Curated annotation (Swiss-Prot):
GO BP annotations listed: negative regulation of translation; translation
Keywords noted in UniProt: Ribonucleoprotein, Ribosomal protein
Signal peptide limits: none
UniProt-recorded name of the protein: Large ribosomal subunit protein uL13
PANTHER family in alphabetical order: LARGE RIBOSOMAL SUBUNIT PROTEIN UL13M (PTHR11545:SF2), RIBOSOMAL PROTEIN L13 (PTHR11545)
Domain of life, source organism: Bacteria
UniProt xrefs under NCBIfam families: rplM_bact (TIGR01066)
Organism name: Geobacter metallireducens (strain ATCC 53774 / DSM 7210 / GS-15)
SUPFAM superfamilies: Ribosomal protein L13 (SSF52161)
GO CC terms: cytosolic large ribosomal subunit
Ranges in a coiled coil: none
Pfam family for this entry, one: Ribosomal_L13
Keyword Ribosomal protein in annotation: yes
Family: Belongs to the universal ribosomal protein uL13 family.
């Protein structure tokens, strides 16, 4: 009888990857990042265990959106009070906090469970080309 090997949290080895977001399309880049954070590219992948790697994204301010999404795509938040809804266009969000645009796109592509919070903590996004993770020697990932 053959059995499937289930990954254990202690056995998982985590690598660091560096992604340059310069002139990359947001959605296509976010799907690749989400798959790496989940560990779907690894042979030891188990849905109930966080087997993913760390991802460092640089140049978030140079991300591209296709079509007219810079003006049309809206992000909403609500305070919980009546009339407390706020909206911001994707173009304004890139100007204010470009890191949030990538983080929100990747978060929407992760599973909606407790593991998603742990997976999202492994995503490090920086607006410019500099990042403080040189000591981890991240491998450059072409998307």
């Amino acid at each position: 009888m053959k059995t499937t090997k289930v990954a254990k949290k202690e056995e998982v080895t985590r690598d660091w990857f560096l992604v340059d977001a310069d002139n990359k399309v947001l959605g296509r880049m976010a799907t690749e990042i989400a798959n790496i954070l989940r560990g779907k590219k690894k042979p030891i992948y188990t849905p109930s265990v966080d087997t993913g790697d760390f991802v460092v994204v640089v140049n978030a301010e140079k991300i591209q959106l296709t079509g007219n999404k810079l003006a049309d795509k809206m992000y909403y938040s609500h305070s919980g009070f009546p009339g407390g809804i706020k909206s911001i266009a994707a173009g304004k969000l890139i100007e204010k906090k470009p890191e949030d645009l990538i983080r929100k796109a990747v978060k929407g592509m992760l599973p909606k469970n407790k593991l998603a919070r742990h997976m999202l903590k492994k995503l490090k996004v920086y607006a410019g080309p500099a990042h403080p993770h040189e000591a981890q020697q991240p491998k450059t990932l072409e998307i």
